[in-house]
C-alpha cells in the first residue's frame, strides 16, 4: 500500500547583513548601498552601522528592516513624542532638525539641478495649528479611541499628547477626549478637527447620527468653558455652527476669514515668512499688474495687492473665490479681483488677462500646474514665483519655463512640516 506524506513547509531564513548608512532621504529613511543599488532603511541615520534584514528586493533598489543598531550618529535625537515610530504622522523625530533640513534640501537640489539658496523655517516644535483626530468607539471596553492613523494602516493610535501641535491644541487634547467620551452618541463619531485661529480655537465634530439634546447641551457647555467656536458636521458637505464666531488668521498684516473646511497653511510661522519672501522675490512695484493662480482665498493675493497697482486672483473652487472677495472687502482692498476659472483652459483669452501681467505667482496642489504652464509662458511675465508642495511636479513644470527662456534665480526649501517626509519649496524664475 502506498503511503503519502505531506511535503514539509519550506522555511526561508532571511539573511542578516551589516551595512553603513551614508545618506538620509527626504522621507527620513537611511540610505545605504548593497549589491550595487540603493538600500532604504527606516530608523538608521547617516554614519550609523546596523544589522538589517532585506524585506523587499527590486531591480533598482531594496528595502530593509533594522535588527540591531551598532552605533549612534551624533545627529541622532531622542524623539519627544511617545507615539513616534507607531503613529504615521512623523517620520524624522529621531534626526536633528539640521539633518532633516540638509537631506530635504539635497533632494530638492538634485531634482531641480540647482543649489538651494536658503531654508525658510520657524520653530520645529509646537508649529501645527490644525489637526484632524480620528474617533472610534470600542464596544468591548466601552472606550473612545481618539488619535492619528498608524503608519501604513487604518488602525488608530490613541494619542494623549502631540508635541508638533501648537501648545493650545496639545493642552486641549485630554479635555476634548473627556468631553467626547461623556456623550451618549459617541458610537457615531467619525473625527474631531481642531484649529487654532487668530481669534481662538475652533472645533469641528463629524457625527454620523443625530445628536440628542443632552449631547448638544454638553457640547455647548464645553465650548463655552473652553472659549472655543464649535461646529457640527452631520454630513461631509454640511457644517452647522453651534457656538462662537467665524475664524480668521493674519497674513502679512491682513486679516483673512475662513471656513473650518477651507485650506489654510498649518504652519503659521513659515506661512508668514513664505508670503514675505514671495513679495520680496517678485519685487512688486507700484505700477505692477500681478496674477495669482491657484489663489485660494487670498493668502498671497491680498498681501500682493498692498504693493501692486492691481492684482487678479484665479481659483478653481467657487467657495474660495467668494471668500477671497469677502476678505478683500474686509481689508479695504479695491485693486484686487477674484475669478473662478478652470485653470486647465487658456486663461490668456479671458477679459481680465488682455492687458497682460508683469509678475505671476502660482501655488498649485500636489498635481502641479502642467496644463497651465504654456498659458503662463504666453503672458510673458518678467518674474514668476512658483510655490510647490510636490518637488516632482515642480521639476516637471520648471522644465517648461526653462525651455521658454526663463532662468531660476532663487530656490528655497520651505520647512513647513518638520519631522515629517513632506518637502515644500518655492522658486523664483526670471525671463532673460
Curated annotation (Swiss-Prot):
Function text: Catalyzes the formation of 5-methyl-uridine at position 1939 (m5U1939) in 23S rRNA.
Keywords for this protein: 4Fe-4S, Iron, Iron-sulfur, Metal-binding, Methyltransferase, rRNA processing, S-adenosyl-L-methionine, Transferase
Entries under InterPro entries matching the protein: 23S_rRNA_MeTrfase_RlmD, MeTrfase_TrmA_AS, MeTrfase_TrmA_CS, NA-bd_OB-fold, SAM-dependent_MTases_sf, TRAM_dom, U5_MeTrfase_fam
Domain TRAM, chain residue ranges per copy: 10-68
Residues binding S-adenosyl-L-methionine: 265, 294, 299, 315, 342, 363
GO molecular function, one term: rRNA (uridine-C5-)-methyltransferase activity
Taxonomic source organism: Citrobacter koseri (strain ATCC BAA-895 / CDC 4225-83 / SGSC4696)
Family: Belongs to the class I-like SAM-binding methyltransferase superfamily. RNA M5U methyltransferase family. RlmD subfamily.
Positions annotated as active site in the UniProt record: 389 (nucleophile)
Binding site for [4Fe-4S] cluster: 81, 87, 90, 162
Catalytic activity of the protein: uridine(1939) in 23S rRNA + S-adenosyl-L-methionine = 5-methyluridine(1939) in 23S rRNA + S-adenosyl-L-homocysteine + H(+)
SUPFAM superfamilies in alphabetical order: Nucleic acid-binding proteins (SSF50249), S-adenosyl-L-methionine-dependent methyltransferases (SSF53335)
Pfam families: TRAM, tRNA_U5-meth_tr
Cross-referenced Gene3D superfamilies: 2.40.50.1070, Nucleic acid-binding proteins, Vaccinia Virus protein VP39
This protein's name: 23S rRNA (uracil(1939)-C(5))-methyltransferase RlmD
E.C. number: 2.1.1.190
Amino acid at each position: 500500500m502506498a503511503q503519502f506524506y505531506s511535503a514539509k513547509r519550506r522555511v526561508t531564513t532571511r539573511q542578516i547583513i551589516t551595512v553603513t548608512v551614508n545618506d538620509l532621504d527626504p522621507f527620513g529613511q537611511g540610505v545605504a548601498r548593497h549589491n550595487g543599488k540603493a538600500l532604504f532603511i527606516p530608523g538608521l541615520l547617516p554614519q550609523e552601522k546596523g544589522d538589517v534584514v532585506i524585506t523587499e528586493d527590486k531591480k533598482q533598489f531594496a528595502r530593509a528592516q533594522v535588527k540591531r543598531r551598532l552605533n549612534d550618529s551624533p545627529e541622532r535625537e531622542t524623539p519627544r513624542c511617545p507615539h513616534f515610530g507607531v503613529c504615521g504622522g512623523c517620520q524624522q523625530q529621531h534626526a536633528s532638525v539640521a539633518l532633516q533640513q540638509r537631506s530635504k534640501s539635497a533632494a530638492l537640489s538634485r531634482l531641480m539641478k540647482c543649489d538651494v539658496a536658503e531654508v525658510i523655517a520657524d520653530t520645529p516644535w509646537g508649529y501645527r495649528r490644525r489637526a484632524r483626530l480620528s474617533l472610534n468607539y470600542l464596544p468591548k471596553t466601552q472606550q473612545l479611541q481618539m488619535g492619528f492613523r498608524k503608519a501604513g494602516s487604518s488602525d488608530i493610535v490613541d494619542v494623549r499628547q502631540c508635541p508638533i501641535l501648537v501648545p493650545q491644541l496639545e493642552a486641549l487634547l485630554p479635555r476634548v477626549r473627556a468631553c467626547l467620551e461623556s456623550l451618549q452618541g459617541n458610537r457615531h463619531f467619525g473625527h474631531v478637527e481642531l484649529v487654532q485661529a487668530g481669534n481662538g480655537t475652533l472645533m469641528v465634530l463629524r457625527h454620523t447620527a443625530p445628536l440628542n439634546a443632552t449631547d448638544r447641551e454638553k457640547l455647548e457647555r464645553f465650548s463655552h468653558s473652553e472659549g472655543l467656536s464649535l461646529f457640527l458636521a452631520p454630513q461631509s458637505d454640511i457644517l452647522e455652527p453651534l457656538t462662537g464666531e467665524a475664524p480668521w488668521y493674519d497674513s502679512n498684516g491682513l486679516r483673512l476669514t475662513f471656513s473650518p473646511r477651507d485650506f489654510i497653511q498649518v504652519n503659521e510661522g513659515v506661512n508668514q515668512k513664505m508670503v514675505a519672501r514671495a513679495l520680496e522675490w517678485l519685487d512688486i512695484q507700484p505700477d505692477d499688474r500681478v496674477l495669482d493662480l491657484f489663489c485660494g482665498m487670498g493668502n498671497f493675493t491680498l498681501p500682493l495687492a498692498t504693493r501692486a497697482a492691481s492684482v487678479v486672483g484665479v481659483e478653481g473652487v467657487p467657495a474660495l473665490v467668494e471668500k477671497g472677495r469677502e476678505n478683500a472687502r474686509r481689508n479695504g482692498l479695491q485693486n484686487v479681483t477674484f475669478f473662478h476659472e478652470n485653470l486647465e483652459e487658456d486663461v490668456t483669452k479671458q477679459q481680465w488677462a488682455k492687458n497682460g501681467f508683469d509678475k505671476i505667482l502660482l501655488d498649485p496642489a500636489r498635481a502641479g500646474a502642467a496644463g497651465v504652464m504654456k498659458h503662463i509662458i504666453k503672458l510673458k511675465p518678467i518674474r514668476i514665483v512658483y510655490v510647490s508642495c510636490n518637488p516632482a511636479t515642480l521639476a516637471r513644470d520648471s522644465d517648461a519655463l526653462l525651455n521658454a527662456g526663463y532662468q531660476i534665480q532663487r530656490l528655497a526649501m520651505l520647512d513647513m512640516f518638520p519631522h515629517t517626509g513632506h518637502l515644500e519649496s518655492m522658486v523664483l524664475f526670471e525671463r532673460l
